[in-house]
Amino acid sequence: MSIPGLGQIAPQQPTTSTTRTITLRPFWEWRFEVPRSSIPTTNAAISAIGLGGAGAGGGGATVRLTSGTAERDGTELALNRTYTFPRNTQSKLLTYTGATLEVSGAFVDSVAQYPAPEASPQLPVLNLHFALQELRAAAAAGGSNHNNNNTNGGGAPGPRVMICGEKDSGKTTVARTLAALATRAGGQPLVGSVDPREGMLALPGTVSAAVFGTVMDVEDPAAGFGVSGTPSSGPSAVPVKLPMVYYVGRERVDEDVPLWRDLVGKLGSAVRDKFAADEVVREAGLLLDTPAASVAKGDLEVLTHVVNEFAGGLLGAGRTAGWQLTVTVNIVVVLGSVDLHAELQRRFENQRTVHGEAITLILLDKSDGVAERDKDFMKFTREAAIKEYFFGDAKRTLSPFTQSVSFDDVAVFRTPDALERAEVSAEMSHWTLAVMNASVNDPPEVIRQAPVMGFVAIADVDEDRRRLKVLSPVSGRLGNRPMIWGRWPEPYINLLG
């Protein structure tokens, strides 16, 4: 289908008031970007970028819904509550019924108008949600009529959706929106990400999955996928999620494909176990975000591997006899790439899941509101996530535990090619290390594929005294837990500087 994006108007011009009122009609979107630093204050520059509100150089945008309904990536805003969006936020607010917003602060914004709901890029996503809800209802009905002693938990589980597309195609936004809509409908879907570039409910450089059964944080720069949605030593604005996390320690999959494959397999096994143990989660299904992929770059094997790992030997690659996996990707959503859709359709057209289902390919147009994220944006996002993990944000201040430990009391492993014990040195300063749920006496392959317990930051290395200053989110000795020093995220930052 075509999404023309008709009626998009020029960015709003500045006003003399610090607060503006924006009126949205049904299916209109208010799109905004809070810059990383100050906004130009000359009249010409302001006119060029459309400064929302006054007070250039402010640290964020504030929004209040005064009438109607509005949501951010599927999570509703409460009426007459003030929301603050921090620096480096790129997002939108959508209304299905019409809404009035009061906005203030320093940001770039515009209103996307559509002559009819059919022209909105959100309508296909909403229709997809309703179709998934029908599949969830069918799974619930099938499960209730099946013998509960079956180890597979009944018939086919709810929909298992893999979302893919090229770089900056809106994959994560669609995954987040579908998760929020499913949660609002009373479901508890499993949501996963096998893209190490950003991290979901964890620091960048990881793959993870978690049950989403509660509301997401509207004010989170990642709209509910950030580290603010996980347990911490301080209060949380929303109920926290409990992710299963595996540490890749690389930015891109192609930097270490064998390692990524192994960890995706571990994540698939964790998802399988959760489906087997929790009927409610099983009925809600899976929503899986994937790394950017294109036919031209030869990324198809990455997506094929994801389907294979979450499909119980669907493609018959390297599975032992008796391999059973209840989590089977049966829906592949492709955003904005006709070539990618056609190639995946060709690869999967004759395949069936372990439940006898055909794999459905769905092509959705890329939203005209998707923002392109440059290297500076991604670097700021990574550093902000690390800082928030240890120190919290504007709503929640955390005080990391600082301890001085001897070189002899820690076990650090590094990953140049294979995992090996590393000598502690000044080079380690300001890096973030993953603490693994394993023992230092375990074989290297066990340590490398173990789940992540948490992260620590090396604030300082004193080679003369052979001491490390370590920041951790909670108090407690590191004990015999091995730590992995990866290649990424970098460049590293001085959290205490």
From Swiss-Prot:
Matches recorded under InterPro entries: Clp1 (IPR028606), Clp1/Grc3 (IPR045116), Clp1_C (IPR010655), Clp1_C_sf (IPR038238), Clp1_N (IPR032324), Clp1_N_sf (IPR038239), CLP1_P (IPR032319), P-loop_NTPase (IPR027417)
Keywords (alphabetical) are:
ATP-binding, mRNA processing, Nucleotide-binding, Nucleus
Question: Gene3D superfamilies this protein is in?
Answer: Clp1, DNA binding domain, P-loop containing nucleotide triphosphate hydrolases, Pre-mRNA cleavage complex subunit Clp1, C-terminal domain
Q: Does the keyword ATP-binding apply?
A: yes
Gene Ontology MF: a single term: polynucleotide 5'-hydroxyl-kinase activity
Subcellular location, principal: nucleus
GO cellular component terms, semicolon-separated: mRNA cleavage factor complex
Give the binding site residues for ATP.
Answer: 29, 168-173
Q: Where is this region: Disordered?
A: 1-20
Q: Which SUPFAM superfamilies match?
A: P-loop containing nucleoside triphosphate hydrolases (SSF52540)
Its subcellular locations are: Nucleus
- GO BP annotations listed: mRNA 3'-end processing; tRNA splicing, via endonucleolytic cleavage and ligation
Question: What is said about its interaction partners and assembly?
Answer: Component of a pre-mRNA cleavage factor complex. Interacts directly with PCF11.
Q: Which HAMAP family match?
A: Clp1 (MF_03035)
Family as reported in the entry's similarity comment: Belongs to the Clp1 family. Clp1 subfamily.
Its function?
Required for endonucleolytic cleavage during polyadenylation-dependent pre-mRNA 3'-end formation.
User: What's the protein called, per UniProt?
Assistant: mRNA cleavage and polyadenylation factor CLP1
Organism, scientific name: Chaetomium globosum (strain ATCC 6205 / CBS 148.51 / DSM 1962 / NBRC 6347 / NRRL 1970) (Soil fungus)
Q: Which gene encodes it?
A: CLP1
